[in-house]
Amino acid sequence: MKRVITRTALTLALAVVSTASLNTQAQSQAPNAGTEPVLAKELAPARSYGKLTVTSAAFQSGGTLEDKYTQNGDNVSPPISWSRGPAGTMSYVVLTEDSGVNRPDPISHWVIYYSPSNVTALPENTPTEAKLENGAMQGLNVRKAAGFVGPKPPAGQMHPYHFEVFALNKRLNIDPATADRATVIAAMKGHVLALGDISANYTGK
């Protein structure tokens, strides 16, 4: 009787260990489990940790983005301004990213590069053209189109949107047809003199 009980207990113990091992393996293989997106400012930090002050007449930092700047409204870009970069600044890059997603890369809503060093603001409703009148270039957003595309998170979900500005010691000569977020970030690494950002939240409807 004792031998039967011992064998039964051993069998149960092995089954528990095997089940735990399978559960652990399944969790480790779950796609993007707990993944948080990495923002551009973390991928291309400032060389000297310089700071730009970024502001908007449309919202306070950490505030709420109005419907007019989203796909639930007019889908126009908000006005963005920033302080002048340090000595040696030759151009600016402006990126808008949604970090409220469970994936390695944020959703890219706006890519601007080659912005001249004397330009420190973008007006509301910036045209969705590859080249702007001020000389800046607009790369590809999440829709693979030039210019700003507004937020449209799932209904009931609040997502943060980061407007990041980078002062560079060079001009990025990139074809607008290929200038997506990843390409611009790769090109500006090691050339960022200063950066700053402002964020706003929006809840899907």
State where each predicted segment sits.
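N-terminus-centered regions that define maturation/targeting leaders and the start
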Residues: L22-K205
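Bacterial N-terminal signal peptides that target proteins for export
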Residues: M1-L10
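Bacterial N-terminal signal peptides
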Residues: A9-A20
